[in-house]
């Protein structure tokens, strides 16, 4: 490398020709280099001639483009050096590893690798130290906002937000609150970081005794139209089997207004099998069409008579006050299911029992 630096140094021609490099005249060095270049050019010329001769023997006549390609290929072979040979793995004898003889494996003796902690340091404290260290960076700033405190009752981690200012706590008038703070201090002693966890240091907030205010709850009354026959119905507010129907006044239309030949004039649609009222002691007080209606709606004869008298009692009192009698009024007056009361309203309306001409005599 020193020879090349001396040979290519920017010195004038006269010192280069007269001087010497490593005690060898520079002119001899230049002649040696020129001789190498001439030999290389001769090799290139021989390669070109060989390629042209081989092409003439194979193709006969050679075109100019073929000559140019042959010259380019020879020059490329001269200028582009061939890559170095890949290293070869020499043959060496394979040495087998020595086998341990008469060694019995005992699985009962196991080696347990555990992390080495400093005195007083565990995994929880290590995680706490790491979070405090990372919280100094803006990217991990939110890692210190919550604390994980074990709950002794269910042994689960409970996330509790740290309270900084006690004045920001909500004021409750009827309850006394006691707030406990858990303080954790991190300090560094003699270059070794350690953590000091205080026991549950409870700080009680001064409690203000406040006289509780009694709140009177107002009962919400349902908005509904009162019964026009409320004064009369108060004497018999509930249905009493075989008794209540006799205590109610009877404003029902006469039974002769119903045809005797048609027992299905009051028939309505109802799901379920009809009730057998052939042995009811009060069936003689019902028209045959009414008996069919009571069987379909599964109403005993005394309950049917009670509902019928309450039905027309409300109709008469509303007629006296000049109020219309609607389906909802019938449902409120009867002490039976609202769907059955609606079927009674439909049946009585179908035969004309709700017409005002039947009740004009009570005005």
From Swiss-Prot:
<dbReference type="GO" id="GO:0006338">
    <property type="term" value="P:chromatin remodeling"/>
</dbReference>
<dbReference type="Pfam" id="PF04433">
    <property type="entry name" value="SWIRM"/>
</dbReference>
<keyword id="KW-0346">Stress response</keyword>
<protein>
    <recommendedName>
        <fullName>SWIRM domain-containing protein YOR338W</fullName>
    </recommendedName>
</protein>
<dbReference type="InterPro" id="IPR009057">
    <property type="entry name" value="Homeodomain-like_sf"/>
</dbReference>
<feature type="domain" description="SWIRM">
    <location>
        <begin position="266"/>
        <end position="363"/>
    </location>
</feature>
<feature type="region of interest" description="Disordered">
    <location>
        <begin position="186"/>
        <end position="208"/>
    </location>
</feature>
<dbReference type="GO" id="GO:0070210">
    <property type="term" value="C:Rpd3L-Expanded complex"/>
</dbReference>
<feature type="region of interest" description="Disordered">
    <location>
        <begin position="1"/>
        <end position="22"/>
    </location>
</feature>
<dbReference type="GO" id="GO:0030437">
    <property type="term" value="P:ascospore formation"/>
</dbReference>
<dbReference type="GO" id="GO:0003713">
    <property type="term" value="F:transcription coactivator activity"/>
</dbReference>
<dbReference type="InterPro" id="IPR036388">
    <property type="entry name" value="WH-like_DNA-bd_sf"/>
</dbReference>
<dbReference type="GO" id="GO:0005634">
    <property type="term" value="C:nucleus"/>
</dbReference>
<dbReference type="GO" id="GO:0006357">
    <property type="term" value="P:regulation of transcription by RNA polymerase II"/>
</dbReference>
<dbReference type="GO" id="GO:0003682">
    <property type="term" value="F:chromatin binding"/>
</dbReference>
<dbReference type="InterPro" id="IPR007526">
    <property type="entry name" value="SWIRM"/>
</dbReference>
<feature type="compositionally biased region" description="Basic and acidic residues">
    <location>
        <begin position="186"/>
        <end position="196"/>
    </location>
</feature>
């Amino acid at each position: 490398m020193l020879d090349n630096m001396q040979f290519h140094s920017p010195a004038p021609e006269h010192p280069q020709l007269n001087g010497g490099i490593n005690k060898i005249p520079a002119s001899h060095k230049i002649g040696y280099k020129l001789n190498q270049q001439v030999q290389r050019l001769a090799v290139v010329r021989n390669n070109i001639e060989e390629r042209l001769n081989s092409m003439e023997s194979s193709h006969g006549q050679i075109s100019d483009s073929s000559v140019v390609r042959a010259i380019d290929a020879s020059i490329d072979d001269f200028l582009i050096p061939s890559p170095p040979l890949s290293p070869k793995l020499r043959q060496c004898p394979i040495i087998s590893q020595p086998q341990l003889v008469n060694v019995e494996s005992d699985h009962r003796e196991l080696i347990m690798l555990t992390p080495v902690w400093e005195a007083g340091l565990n995994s929880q404290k290590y995680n706490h130290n790491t979070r405090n260290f990372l919280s100094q960076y803006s990217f991990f700033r939110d890692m210190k906002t919550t604390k994980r405190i074990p709950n002794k009752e269910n042994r689960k981690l409970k996330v509790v937000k740290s309270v900084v200012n006690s004045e920001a706590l909500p004021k409750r008038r009827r309850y006394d609150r006691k707030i406990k703070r858990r303080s954790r201090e991190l300090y560094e002693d003699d270059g070794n970081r350690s953590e000091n966890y205080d026991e549950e240091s409870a700080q009680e907030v001064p409690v203000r005794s406040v006289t509780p205010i009694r709140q009177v709850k107002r009962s919400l009354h349902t908005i509904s139209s009162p019964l026009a026959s409320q004064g009369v119905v108060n004497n018999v507010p509930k249905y009493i089997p075989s008794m209540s129907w006799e205590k109610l006044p009877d404003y029902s239309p006469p039974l002769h207004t119903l045809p005797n030949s048609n027992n299905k004039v009051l028939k309505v649609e109802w799901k379920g099998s009809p009730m057998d009222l052939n042995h009811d002691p009060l069936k003689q007080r019902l028209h045959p069409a009414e008996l069919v209606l009571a069987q379909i709606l599964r109403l005993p004869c005394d309950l049917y008579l009670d509902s019928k008298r309450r039905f027309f009692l409300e109709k008469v009192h509303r007629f006296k006050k000049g109020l219309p009698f609607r389906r909802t009024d019938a449902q409120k007056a009867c002490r039976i299911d609202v769907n059955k009361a609606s079927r009674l309203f439909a049946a009585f309306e179908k035969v004309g029992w709700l017409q005002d001409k039947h009740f004009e005599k009570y005005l």
